Amino acid sequence: MANPASYRPRTGEIPTNPGVYRFRDPHGRVIYVGKAKSLRSRLNSYFANPAGLLPKTYAMVHAASSVEWTVVGSELESLQLEYTWIKEFKPRFNVVFRDDKTYPYLAVTLGEKYPRVQVMRGDKRKGTRYFGPYTAGAIRETMDTLLRVFPVRSCSAGVFKRAESSGRPCLLGYIDKCSAPCVGRISPEDHRALAEDFCAFMGGEAKRFTNKLEKQMAAAVARLDYEQAARIRDDITALRKVFERNAVVLAEDTDADVFALHEDELEAAVQVFHVRGGRIRGQRGWVVEKVEDFTTPDLVEHLLQQVYGEDGETHGRLPREVLVPVAPSNAEELTEWLSGIRGARVDVRVPQRGDKAALMSTVRENAEHALKLHKTRRAGDLTVRSQALQELQEALDLPVPLLRIECFDVSHVQGTNVVASMVVVEDGLPKKSDYRKFSITGPAASDDTAAMHDVLTRRFRHYLQDKSAQVDEDVLEAGTAEAAAEAAADAAAEAAVADTTTPIPKTKFAYPPNLVVVDGGQPQVNAAARALADLGIDDVYVVGLAKRLEEVWLPDSDFPVILPRTSQGLYLLQRIRDEAHRFAISFHRQKRGKAMTVSALDGVPGLGASKRKALLAHFGSVKGVKAATPEELAQAKGIGPALAAAIVSHFTGGGPAAVTVPAINMTTGEIIET
């Protein structure tokens, strides 16, 4: 770990202006972004007494090797720049309000010809309207109930196309929970109107629809159509059941998000209730670790910045009111920023009395319970992870902590479709965004050791390339007196804002591991170590985990390291190895599936997939292609005289890749058509 004194800038070099600062690790990766009203005061607080810092801040300062800053003209600009950098660099030590992903959304795909109602998680899409978030059980119950009244399509594209081609709707079409636009029971216009009514009901206009249905029921009774009246009565009951599931907590015209938090010295739990039309429409929760000695107003500011920067900026779901437990830091600038995102005024308020204050108290109780539950669950998990990493470091006699581990596995079936996987673990937890897949061809696919050497060479060659090209885009280089003086002079002269939003090139492999784990024994370990040595890399340690006896092998060692069967370090290695194996197998199956069908046309030089399809569409089968003359072949789309001659030469034995085998489905052994 670096000594903070080795990169501490001189006090006189740091400007007293507002600005945003970044800490980088020895590999140039941004690990923390912060903002300050006075850069000098804030940065000095990191170095004056490192021993007095919070544990995570202490770890961040010692993991960094440099600090740099950018001077801005106002606190609003520093807020915007800090958010931009956190979103771009995803620093590992920043407070990140990660959704627990328990709550999906009810989505209506209004951008499609036939809108679809479905449950969705993850990134939001344009042309789709979202309601929620809700709990998984509640959303499916709501959807099932509403499809009685609004029978909107809910099937996937594949099911819809099959029904369209067969002329028969799916089961929902037969039980009247879908209007079956796939078979023409309803026009596209009427189906869209149905989907828009669904959205209007979910948006809070329930009373309009129940009143409308009550009039229809009365009309049905008047004409003695009691069966129709009974169906409408059941629809009204279903709508009221959904509508009453969310209790009215505020005035009906109230749209607000109510935030509350409960915190201790190290962590904070956040809960938010989404109130639309006076009713609680959804709930979300987060638990975050504190990096700095944040006050509650600081936490509220970061919370709103991240929640609405991600959701509101792209999807426009910012309500008119945001209720918070305490006024956030930089409240005026934050309100201005949120209003700019919404396109209309947003009020950030602290409720003092009445129904809103009572609801805030309920949300706070939820946050308190969430933090207790999180600590109960995490206590054992955090202890076990720390113990596993410590045991592994001691057993392998490594001088550095195992902050990042990468594991590689090779997968194939009798030397065909050779692939490899790379999985990443940081702080004992999988980091799936850094997982990578490799296809292996040529001589490297001849055996496992050659494949392992090839994969490690490719991965760390990328690392060396990314490392050399990573930090070229910074506008203001901190840590030098010249840069700081220039920034201070610019700010004093015209309060200019440095242009720091230039995108930095994305790097895939710029961050190296402390430990490489390979699936295999001594041969695979030696191949991996040789790949690193060939590239001149000597600060990454390599081990292998052999499956048979779960032995840990080191490079050029005649005997393995034996870890106790109850060792948490061994369990960690096994979990990483098994995850790499799973990831490699899934990629191998995917690749093998694409190659399941081989054809006699595959070996024709210059004949790609689209031209093969054109030939088969023109002649009907491979047999028809074989029987065609060059002139007939040239009539097919995309086939010129030279390619037509090559096809004829291929089938008559004149080509180098002539084949006589029929097309075969490699899974079933079925002869397709020749």
From Swiss-Prot:
Keywords: Cytoplasm, DNA damage, DNA excision, DNA repair, Excision nuclease, SOS response. It comes from Pseudarthrobacter chlorophenolicus (strain ATCC 700700 / DSM 12829 / CIP 107037 / JCM 12360 / KCTC 9906 / NCIMB 13794 / A6). Residues 16-95 form the GIY-YIG domain. One of its GO terms (biological process) is SOS response. The keyword Transferase does not apply. It comes from the Bacteria. This is UvrABC system protein C. SUPFAM superfamilies: C-terminal UvrC-binding domain of UvrB (SSF46600), GIY-YIG endonuclease (SSF82771), RuvA domain 2-like (SSF47781).
